[in-house]
């Protein structure tokens, strides 16, 4: 039963992420970072489907993740990536807003929520998140901070493929997303700690 719940949680997180990406960001030329961003740029340059690139480009990262984190994480992450690839083939709605500023804010919040949920369920949606999770265990940097570090390089290079306006909006979206990832991955633990401290104080 717990495996079914985990699979549903991972699939739901991937769905949330896909909505943020395909409904808010991409239609307004604001892109994702990490391997997803690389896949979006590759799809733009070659005309090959994004869903193909997102699987192929993630394989080396998850081989590394298998060695460093384990089979359970790797399987969960591959399942999440397959869900993202599948959802992206079905979710192609008209953008909720044509305002790039609004799409940046809400898209960043939604994709951050989706990534955070997947991490809490033991998986990953992007190869750079594999490195971020390992860095979180071995360095003082949080998952969100490490992801943002990679995105500064990847999203900066997107200006050559799309436009510099798109690159700048994308950087803003990911500043919002990485804060949202931290809220989801660490916020519940911090809230539990506050409740424990408050309970002891009342006693």
Predicted regions and their residues:
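Core subunits and conserved enzymes of cellular information-processing
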Residues: 1-201
